[in-house]
């Protein structure tokens, strides 16, 4: 097992490139899909335990008509609020309400860093507080033991639409991604992985990525920010 044992959901919408479609991936179930069920307005994917691993809505303005009166979907990532998950549950006929507020972005602490010979990469172990330490291959210059940063779990979706998968990099397993502020759509420049205020507990969900909010009280800037 390499996932964090708790489910989370990534919801992604893009009007133009996805032609008004929205997709969702349920992270810790994302690699166990066995069958697909279709409707003219949606489809979903189910594993051998009869649990949904992901879903698509082909015309969200139709499926979420009343919902659109009080809420607009963001271009890109959308936070899985209780209201959204209730509506998705109603449409699919599956209870996904427990996924409300469950996101793939979590605060982690780097507990070991080993350079990979003849590359700029490092083999890192990170602690999320939710499971055993995870192996991540990272190329950031600023990664170091003891720093807190943001982990995107396997099955999570970045603001760019990229889905994070378990992979091998330079011959080593990597089961997630440590992200820069640029990759989290918080900053235009890529200055290494984001550094989180050391007072923040590991395992906390990192929701700034949904708010497009730069330098919250969680983020370490040049001047240390004290928690209120």
From Swiss-Prot:
Residues 99-207 form the tRNA-binding domain. Keywords: RNA-binding, tRNA-binding. Pfam families: tRNA_bind. GO terms for molecular function: tRNA binding. InterPro entries: NA-bd_OB-fold, tRNA-bd_dom, tRNA_bind_bactPheRS, YtpR-like_sf. This is Uncharacterized protein MG449.
